């Protein structure tokens, strides 16, 4: 969303609205501060005058971890200075079918390259553990979309990824292994299904695999109304998730 419903506001308006959200959340009964996130996936593109970079498909072609970390660090600074806390990036998708309309979101079809560049991106956004982790100018990062979004049958978006668990992890899970090692704070669930079951309602993958086996200790966040993709669910109600 844009400050006060208008796209042409400058950074001071973003900061003003962020402060208003924060104060409103702190004045509630529980006093839990709000976390405001944005899809700054190749620059803080909702902010007028922000620097924009190529999408991941272009950045992946460089195979340059230092460059990716530097770019993410620049984006983090602009998100931070606008008063926001979180970016829904990086995507660590592994596109395996060029028919998929979101192949541009992935660094590569090579899981090892996705893992290395995803790790570099997270460290650019959040900083490095023991050095500058979430210090001034850094923001929370999100590894997405867990898991198998780039491996659906015939490249259908929000489709069905039919793989064994070993192949799912070996091909589509390596970006999460590497970003969890860098203490990524958020992981976003995917719209797709795995062997016929939607990810947003899949406890085994989101809890048993991601948290208990992979060791993710952060926040699992849904994609845009992703819970309504689960059978029997709606945007306003989904007990299955």
What are these regions (language model features)?
Residues 1-241:
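Glycoside hydrolase catalytic-domain context in secreted enzymes
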């Amino acid at each position: 969303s844009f400050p006060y419903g208008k796209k042409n506001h400058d950074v001071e308006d973003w900061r003003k609205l962020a402060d208003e959200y924060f104060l409103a959340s702190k004045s509630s009964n529980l006093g839990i501060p709000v976390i405001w996130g944005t899809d700054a996936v190749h620059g803080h593109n909702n902010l007028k005058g922000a620097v924009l970079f190529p999408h991941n498909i272009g950045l992946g072609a460089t195979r340059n971890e230092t460059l990716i970390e530097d770019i993410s660090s620049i984006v983090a600074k602009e998100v931070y200075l606008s008063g926001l806390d979180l970016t829904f990036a990086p995507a660590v998708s592994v596109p395996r079918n060029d028919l998929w309309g979101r192949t541009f979101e992935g660094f590569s079809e090579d899981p090892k390259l996705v893992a290395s560049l995803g790790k570099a991106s997270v460290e650019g956004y959040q900083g490095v553990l023991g050095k500058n982790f979430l210090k001034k100018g850094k923001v929370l990062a999100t590894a997405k979309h867990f898991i198998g979004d780039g491996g659906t049958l015939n490249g259908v978006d929000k489709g069905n990824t039919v793989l064994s668990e070993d192949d799912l992890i070996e091909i589509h899970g390596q970006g999460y292994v590497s970003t969890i090692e860098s203490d990524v704070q958020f992981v976003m669930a995917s719209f797709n299904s795995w062997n016929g079951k939607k990810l947003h309602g899949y406890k085994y993958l989101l809890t048993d695999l991601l948290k208990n086996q992979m060791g993710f200790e952060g926040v699992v966040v849904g994609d845009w109304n992703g819970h309504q993709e689960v059978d029997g669910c709606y945007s306003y109600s989904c007990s299955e998730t």
